[in-house]
Amino acid sequence: MNKKYDIAVVIGRFEPFHNIHKQLVDKALELGEKVVLLLGTAKVAPDPKNPFTVDFRTAMIQSCYHGEDRKRLNFNGLRDKPYNEALWLAEAQNIIREYQDDIIIEKNIEYTDVTYHAALGQVKVALVGYEKDNTSYYIHKFPQWTLEHFNGNTPEGKVLNATDIRKMYFEDDRYEHLVPPEVGTLLHSFKSTQTYIDLKQEYSFTKQYKADTRFVNAPYDPIFNTTDAVLVCNGHVLLVKRGFNPGRGLWALPGGFLQSDLWILDNAIKELREETKIKVSSERLRNSLKGFHVFEYPYRSFRDVVVMMRLEQDGFQYLHCQIMKISSLKTTLK
């Protein structure tokens, strides 16, 4: 096998993996001895925008390939870092560097600590990028890799958007012609799962919510602010389970919508006490404040204002809600 590059990198969410995505991976297989797919938005709770786990997305892509091509595909989850792009870039680079290290060993490239970066330079890496819209700007953020542009359109010359396919999927429209047959089979099977049933209910809830006449005729898109309290004690965090959509059944921070007549901190304390029935005074909670942060990533479901608090070590003896070790939260999503 004599390919132009040692590694061809493809970055995407693939929710779901559709026909143009397959063309993208096909091109990567033409260019690289080894293809590394970085599956974005990894380890998040499922919602109608990101319904599939990394494992399921991997299965969708693998189902489309066989033999040697399938063996050449390598999959890694890549978590979003919307408030720290440098960290996101570093994580992607570190994943690829591990593959570069393997190839250095395979090729018996000798190096010392001083010449290590020169050795890395002998491993040819390309990013196969699909510049679909303004969300694809990241493909220009890896100058150390050669950028191989991919221009994929449908036979009619249109851009195929996974957002439209998800809409068809949750509204029971025909989408099968837009995805590889193997993916269509997996998506059909997924419809029988409880996860799909819950997501479809959430999709319908959100669609109806957005269609509310109070917002349809507004001169500007409505922005809904919420205040959520992060209450920490002895390495544990206080969580509540959502009883309604969106996110019914998921663990969440206690909080709610910001009332127009309340300060942010007052609203956070009010919601915390109402949702958890915590037997700690508002004054004590206010005095326990360690800081707050605004999370305004525009692709969040809503614009959230998260107020962070920390109680004394005995703070949880009065709680009637679930507390979890912070360290355990890292392993709950796959």
PLM features: what roles do these ranges have?
Residues 10, 223-225, 312:
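Short, basic and Ser/Thr-rich N-terminal targeting/leader segments
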Residues 148-150, 313-334:
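NUDIX/MutT-family hydrolases
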Residues 18-21, 309-310, 332:
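Histidine-centered active-site/metal-ligand motif
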Residues 129-133, 242-243, 314:
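Short, well-ordered beta-to-alpha junction loops that form the rim of enzyme active sites
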Residues 1-214:
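Nucleotidyltransferase catalytic core that binds NTPs
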Residues 207-253:
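N-terminal strand-loop-strand
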Residues 277-322:
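Active-site segment of metal-dependent pyrophosphate-handling enzymes
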Residues 61, 253-292:
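The catalytic Nudix box helix
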